[in-house]
């Protein structure tokens, strides 16, 4: 687990998230891509969580979910593709690329879940393309009401490999008491 810190996947300090929320920690799973041993560990976690779901196609959420959905699709020999943040304004003008999802049971894959907005938009895009979303899978749920927001807005259950508090417990020996306490206190402010 120390490798997550060493590779810069998990950082502590002051960060502004894509949602505009300020946070004392940042998790960037894209950084794992430069470390094959970490990719193997991340993919193993995703595979374990996916074993609970029956699906036909995997779709990564742009951009963090794309590499992992691709690897998972390849390993499981399932069709895969990705969901753009918005439909292209040219060519086919599609939001869902890669596999044709019409009539298929899809799992939407992302790296980190905060508010749930990216997943909500991706689920809506898959449905508009004729797919049935049977679940959403993230590596890390930051426990900031994202899974509840997704369920409330779309009816789709979010599965995660890790919850942030679990990850913090595991990382505690490597991050120091100050960072650990700041992160736990920050998470305690979120009531869903």
UniProtKB/Swiss-Prot annotation:
Protein name in the entry: Orotate phosphoribosyltransferase
SUPFAM superfamilies attached to this UniProt entry: PRTase-like
Family statement drawn from the similarity comment of this UniProt entry: Belongs to the purine/pyrimidine phosphoribosyltransferase family. PyrE subfamily.
Gene3D superfamilies: 3.40.50.2020
Species assigned in the record: Pyrobaculum calidifontis (strain DSM 21063 / JCM 11548 / VA1)
Residues reported to bind orotate: 114, 142
GO biological process annotation, one example: 'de novo' UMP biosynthetic process
Assembly with partners or alone: Homodimer.
InterPro entries for this protein: OPRT, Or_phspho_trans_dom, PRibTrfase_dom, PRTase-like
């Amino acid at each position: 687990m120390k490798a997550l810190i060493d590779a810069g996947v998990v950082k502590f300090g002051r960060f502004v998230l894509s949602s505009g929320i300020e946070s004392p920690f940042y998790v960037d799973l894209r950084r794992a891509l430069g470390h094959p041993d970490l990719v193997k560990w991340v993919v193993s976690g995703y595979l374990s969580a996916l074993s609970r779901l029956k699906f036909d196609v995997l779709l990564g959420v742009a951009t963090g979910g794309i590499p992992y959905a691709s690897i998972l699709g390849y390993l499981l020999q399932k069709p895969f593709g990705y969901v753009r943040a918005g439909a292209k304004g040219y060519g086919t003008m599609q939001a869902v690329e890669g596999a044709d999802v019409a009539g298929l049971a899809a799992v939407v894959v992302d790296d980190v879940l905060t508010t749930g907005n990216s997943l909500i938009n991706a689920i809506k895009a898959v449905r508009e393309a004729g797919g049935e979303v049977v679940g959403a899978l993230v590596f890390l749920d930051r426990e900031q009401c994202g899974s509840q927001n997704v369920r409330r807005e779309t009816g789709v259950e979010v599965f995660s490999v890790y919850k942030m508090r679990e990850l913090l417990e595991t990382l505690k020996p490597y991050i120091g008491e100050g960072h650990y306490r700041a992160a736990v206190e920050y998470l305690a402010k979120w009531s869903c």
